[in-house]
Structure formats: C-alpha cells, structure tokens
Regions:
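Conformational coupling and interaction surfaces
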Residues: 1-124
C-alpha cells in the first residue's frame, strides 16, 4: 500500500489544544517524544500535522479502515528527469502500462479516526 503526502499531510491532521495539553500532562515517553516533535516543527513555522506523516502508515497497518484505497499500476522513476525518484501512477483507462505492479494507493483518510488512534496509542 502506498500512502502519499496528499493523504498523510493534511490540515485536518492537526492536534487540538486539548490534545496538546494531554501530551504535556503525560509522563509517557511516547507522548513526550510527540510533544517534542511538535515543538520542533512549530518553531520552524509548521503545524503539528507535519509530525504525523509516518504515523499514518502505522495507523493504517493497525486499522486499514482509516484510509480508503484504490488499485493502480505504479512505477518508480529511476532515470533522470522531472519525476526522478517519484512514484508514478498510470491512471489511464486505455493503453495502461500493464507491466507495472498493481498497488493499493491511499485516496483519503478518516483524519478524526486517525488522530483518535494516535492519541490513544501515545497516551496509554
């Protein structure tokens, strides 16, 4: 399964003031680590959602209902050019590159469900 930044980095994946207060009040190492990461990105002008990009993939592994997926033929560009190193989806309905593997691709996430799981995991 491929979860792109368009799904994992979303403004709706931001913690509330109550969430931040709960992290501050916790002595769990996971909560302290997340709070430290949030401070780090906040001090650089970014929001808390920047700290949870990889967490979305872990959450999907725990509960696949968090992300809606679809299947598509996907390749990774390895030659020089504009898309070097990028994952490329062949979204055409005809002349599809059938030699490419079919991958499950994240379309959208249930951000509220994700944040609830994230907070439960770091606070328990």
């Amino acid at each position: 399964t491929c979860l792109g930044l368009d799904v994992a980095t979303h403004f709706d994946v931001n913690l509330t003031d109550d969430d931040i207060a709960a992290l501050d009040a916790s002595d769990k190492p996971e909560a302290k680590f997340l709070r430290q990461a949030i401070r780090f990105v906040n001090n650089r002008g970014f929001e808390a959602y920047c700290t949870s990009i990889d967490c979305m993939a872990v959450a999907y592994a725990i509960d696949p209902s968090i992300v809606e997926t679809f299947e598509g033929h996907v390749g990774v560009e390895t030659k020089d050019g504009l898309t070097l190193g990028m994952t490329v989806l062949d979204a055409r309905h005809h002349f599809v590159w059938k030699q490419l593997p079919v991958v499950h691709i994240g379309r959208k996430a249930d951000h509220a469900k994700f944040l609830q799981l994230l907070m439960e995991l770091v606070l328990q």
